[in-house]
UniProtKB/Swiss-Prot annotation:
It comes from the Eukaryota. Phosphorylated on serine and threonine residues. Aldosterone and insulin increase the basal level of phosphorylation. PROSITE patterns: ASC. This is Epithelial sodium channel subunit gamma. This is one of the three pore-forming subunits of the heterotrimeric epithelial sodium channel (ENaC), a critical regulator of sodium balance and fluid homeostasis. ENaC operates in epithelial tissues, where it mediates the electrodiffusion of sodium ions from extracellular fluid through the apical membrane of cells, with water following osmotically. It plays a key role in maintaining sodium homeostasis through electrogenic sodium reabsorption in the kidneys. Additionally, ENaC is essential for airway surface liquid homeostasis, which is crucial for proper mucus clearance. Originally identified and characterized by its inhibition by the diuretic drug amiloride.
Amino acid sequence: MAPGEKIKAKIKKNLPVRGPQAPTIKDLMHWYCMNTNTHGCRRIVVSRGRLRRLLWIAFTLTAVALIIWQCALLVFSFYTVSVSIKVHFQKLDFPAVTICNINPYKYSAVSDLLTDLDSETKQALLSLYGVKESRKRREAGSMPSTLEGTPPRFFKLIPLLVFNENEKGKARDFFTGRKRKISGKIIHKASNVMHVHESKKLVGFQLCSNDTSDCATYTFSSGINAIQEWYKLHYMNIMAQVPLEKKINMSYSAEELLVTCFFDGMSCDARNFTLFHHPMYGNCYTFNNKENATILSTSMGGSEYGLQVILYINEDEYNPFLVSSTGAKVLIHQQNEYPFIEDVGMEIETAMSTSIGMHLTESFKLSEPYSQCTEDGSDVPVTNIYNAAYSLQICLYSCFQTKMVEKCGCAQYSQPLPPAANYCNYQQHPNWMYCYYQLYQAFVREELGCQSVCKQSCSFKEWTLTTSLAQWPSEASEKWLLNVLTWDQSQQINKKLNKTDLAKLLIFYKDLNQRSIMESPANSIEMLLSNFGGQLGLWMSCSVVCVIEIIEVFFIDFFSIIARRQWHKAKDWWARRQTPPSTETPSSRQGQDNPALDTDDDLPTFTSAMRLPPAPGSTVPGTPPPRYNTLRLDRAFSSQLTDTQLTNEL
């Protein structure tokens, strides 16, 4: 064998064999871990320290277990041929139903409090339209019809004015007949009465502050609206001074209002209703309220399985100046919700059967940062003065009532009282009407800041209502039906009933299909991680293990090396400072003593294997050895061992 071949065979014999030709399984696994694209296996081999190796072993085994589990689920799901059928019969909670008579108090019970006000109102109607009191009222002897000898107290507090379009800036005082110059703001309010011909006269009233220097005039195209608004202001002032217990007694009891009651085909009575006193509608009664032990539910749809009541309206006890329609008001709401009957209540007619079909819709919105809604109102800086769950309407009215107490010194009569506040009245707060109207105009123009502070509730229920009417009772059944109801209510009603005194109401679910509207984030954490993983895997072939490697190298090892270098520099600086400077010149270092000599701790190559260590006790010469031609081995290993090629001869 040639000398070159012998040296080559000897070097191959001494060098370890790597790769698929490795002699042992340990060497094979070592080669695999060093050359595979699976990141975790390589980190197990190259990591220094027992703790890091254990952590990488745990990470890798966990990833392998998750892969096996997910793949097994996918395989089982693929080969499983089955279907699932779910049959669900649901019951829907029946909502709370609040019923009020449109007339808040019996006229016979409050007539003593309203005698002077009604007399002045009659005079205004007589002067404007020639309207006189009905014969029925006169025969009842309710009150005098003239104001002879009586000072016009209410006209003096809020003067009624008649405006003529031909005379700008002037108005005629309704009581004295004198013309006066109108200064300040003139606010025209729309009328809800239809006019075929446009009227050239406007009726209104003037509100002034205490010093009468600042006034506001409100005009109406219809005198009916002007007088009703004027009457309502005085009415609220009078009723605000009446104790609550007395007002409850002056209104309708549950036994008077409710003639018959059925729910889901079973009889119910006044005990199933809860009293709720409303400032503007008197005694109202709520069916299926939150104060009940259990919330009633229904398992069937249709008119036969809802709430059926017959109401006694008693038109003879209506206040002719406060309300101009006959019937009842109904509101469907949640059990913990305040019934804003004056805003969203439905009116039902007398001598009619009103059927209301419901369809439930639940809405769930996402809170911040997806929307500006609130979960329970705790993050809204407005005190809830209602004994009910938060809603946007409650927040707006609470905000306005709080501003009313701050600006005017008293609370508006139609809303609940804030803590340590009283309702407005002339005696204690003579300026409250002007203050209230000015504040309300600012509220409508969104100048109080309530609309910007209050938020919509994130979750709420609403019922889509379908209303149908039918004449009730029919002519064929009217006689016997009214006789039976009169006999049945003889203890509560001391007169023969007629159909204009009664109203029938049916409230039911059209079907039990419940619609839910739920918001969900378009981009969730899972979606974000999935998108990141897809991009990293597509462009860099990177996985979760690769991310952990990056964290280890660039956030742990990187800063550890920097800190270690700074620490060594500090130690060297401190050592040089402590050691006195030496006068001896350092000897030149050559060979292995030279710091420029690179020592490699990696696996041996042919070049490093040929670099034999010096003999013990020998010194490395400072001059290079002579060039002997017998040591030239480039021809022997020119094709195999390129590392031994020497430089060109000098």
